[in-house]
C-alpha cells in the first residue's frame, strides 16, 4: 500500500502479507507512505516484505503505533523523516526490528527527532533476504534497533529480547561501505538518548564480521548498546550518546 505526496494520512487495521515465506521475490514494502505529512499508522500487521514491512520515508509528523511487523527484512523503518513517534508495536522475527535511517541522494533528508518507546523488539534473527543492492541488505540478521545517521533520537521504555547481533546499534552511513557524493548529507548520528529500556539475551550470535571480532575479543556477548565510534570531526562522544 503506497501513499505518496499526501497530507493527513490514516492507515488503520490493515494487514499486508506475503504468504510464501521470506523470499527475495516478495514485494519491497507492506505499508509505504512517502513524502507525506501528518501520518497515522495504527493497528497494522505487516509480514514478509523484502525491504520494510512498515516504511515511512521523507515525511514529517508521523505516528506508528499498536502494530505488528514480523518476518520482514526491516520490521518498521523511519527513513529521512522528522518528528516520528513509534510506540506500542511488536517487531519480531525480522532481520532488523526497527530502523531509523537517513540516507544520501534523496529529495528529502536530514532525518531527526524520532522517539521509539513502549515497543517489544524481540528475536529479530531472520536471515537477510533483501534483493541485491538494497540498502537494507547491509543490515545484519539479529539487529533489534538500528539508528543510522539520524539525529535527536530518544529510545525508552522498550523491551529488547534475544536479538542475536545486538539489541541496539548506532552507526554512521560509512558502515555500509557505499560511496556518496551528496555535499549536503550528514553521515553521522548525533544526540542519541537511550534510557529506561529492558534487555534480555541478545548479542550471542552476531551476523557481522566486526561484531564477531568484538565478541571474540571480549569472550562475551555483544553489549546491549553498540556504537560504531564514528563522529563528525570536532565532535565529542558526549554529543553522540
Locations of regions flagged by a protein language model:
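Structured C-terminal portions of repeat-based eukaryotic scaffold domains
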Residues: 160, 166, 170-171, 185, ...
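Acidic, glycine- and Ser/Thr-rich low-complexity intrinsically disordered tracts
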Residues: 176-241
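Active-site lining segments that contact anionic ligands and/or coordinate catalytic metals
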Residues: 140-142, 150, 165, 189-194, ...
Amino acid at each position: 500500500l503506497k501513499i505518496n505526496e499526501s497530507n493527513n494520512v490514516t492507515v488503520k487495521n490493515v494487514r499486508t502479507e506475503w504468504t510464501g515465506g521470506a523470499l527475495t521475490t516478495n514485494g519491497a514494502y507492506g505499508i509505504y507512505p512517502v513524502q507525506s505529512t501528518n501520518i497515522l499508522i495504527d493497528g497494522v500487521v505487516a509480514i514478509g516484505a523484502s525491504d520494510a514491512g512498515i516504511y515511512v520515508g521523507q515525511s514529517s509528523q508521523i505516528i506508528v503505533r499498536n502494530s505488528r511487523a514480523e518476518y520482514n527484512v526491516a520490521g518498521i523503518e523511519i527513513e529521512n523523516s522528522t518528528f516520528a513517534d513509534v510506540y506500542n508495536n511488536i517487531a519480531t522475527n525480522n532481520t532488523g526490528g526497527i530502523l531509523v535511517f537517513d540516507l544520501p541522494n534523496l529529495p528529502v533528508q536530514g532525518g531527526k527527532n524520532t522517539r521509539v518507546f513502549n515497543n517489544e523488539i524481540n528475536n529479530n534473527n531472520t536471515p537477510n533476504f533483501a534483493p541485491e543492492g538494497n540498502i537494507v541488505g547491509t543490515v545484519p540478521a539479529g539487529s533489534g534497533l538500528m539508528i543510522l545517521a539520524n539525529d535527536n533520537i530518544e529510545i525508552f521504555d522498550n523491551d529488547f529480547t534475544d536479538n542475536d547481533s545486538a539489541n541496539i546499534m548506532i552507526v554512521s552511513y560509512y558502515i555500509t561501505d557505499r560511496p556518496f557524493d551528496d555535499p549536503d548529507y550528514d553521515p553521522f548520528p548525533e544526540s542519541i538518548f537511550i534510557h529506561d529500556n529492558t534487555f534480555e539475551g541478545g548479542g550471542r550470535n552476531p551476523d557481522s564480521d566486526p561484531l564477531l571480532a568484538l565478541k571474540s575479543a571480549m569472550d562475551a556477548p555483544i553489549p546491549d548498546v553498540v556504537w560504531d565510534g564514528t563522529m563528525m570531526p570536532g565532535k565529542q562522544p558526549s554529543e553522540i550518546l
